[in-house]
Amino acid sequence: MKEEKKLLLREVEEKISASQGFILLRYLGFTAAHSREFRNSLSGVSAEFEVLKKRIFFKAMQSAGFDIDSSDTSGHLGVVFAYDDAVSAAKQVLDFNKQYNDSLVFLAGRIDSANLSGKEVEAVAKLPSMKELRQQIVGLLAAPMSQVVGIMGSALSGVISCIDQKTQKN
């Protein structure tokens, strides 16, 4: 193996070990402007996009001890390395993909030490985020409380109006 390839292999191995997860993508019709915009959007979620040679990537995966299905990796291969939250990175990829007419295809991924197929990564990306789940829980808890307050308020106003009517009769 040439020295350049060995350095590239070491670099990819380091990125795999430093990341919380990664997403394997096939990209179609990607211009330089799309690539730059995609990379910029990923930087907001502590992730980066790399275009890699398949052989180098799968060799790095093998040396890191990961086993990802490589049967459907025809075409150009891109990898999103997520250094903070792999789910947020997957959501960002999905949002970008919707914006640019499905120019990215999920092939596989590794999120929270679980190997996932492309469909599974896409399903994870469609799940609500922790922030959204917290907001939904707060909404579920707040709704009954506001109803109780409303019922108590109407009951109290009924008692007050009854007392008011009694005092006006006398």
UniProtKB/Swiss-Prot annotation:
Report if keyword Transport is assigned: no
Q: Which GO terms describe its cellular component?
A: large ribosomal subunit
Q: Name one GO molecular function term.
A: large ribosomal subunit rRNA binding
- Give the top-rank taxon of the lineage listed in the UniProt record for this protein: Bacteria
Which cysteine-cysteine pairs are annotated as disulfide bonds in the entry?
A: none
Q: List, alphabetically, the SUPFAM superfamilies matched.
A: Ribosomal protein L10-like
Q: Which keywords label this protein? A: Ribonucleoprotein, Ribosomal protein, RNA-binding, rRNA-binding
* Classification via InterPro entries: Ribosomal_uL10, Ribosomal_uL10-like_sf, Ribosomal_uL10_bac, Ribosomal_uL10_bac_type, Ribosomal_uL10_CS_bac
Query: Its Gene Ontology biological processes?
Result: translation
Q: Which NCBIfam families match?
A: PRK00099.1-1
Q: Which HAMAP family match?
A: Ribosomal_uL10 (MF_00362)
Give the function comment from the record. Answer: Forms part of the ribosomal stalk, playing a central role in the interaction of the ribosome with GTP-bound translation factors.
Q: Subunit details for this protein?
A: Part of the ribosomal stalk of the 50S ribosomal subunit. The N-terminus interacts with L11 and the large rRNA to form the base of the stalk. The C-terminus forms an elongated spine to which L12 dimers bind in a sequential fashion forming a multimeric L10(L12)X complex.
Q: Which family does it belong to?
A: Belongs to the universal ribosomal protein uL10 family.
Q: What is this protein called?
A: Large ribosomal subunit protein uL10
Tell me the organism. Chlamydia abortus (strain DSM 27085 / S26/3)
Q: Give the gene symbol.
A: rplJ
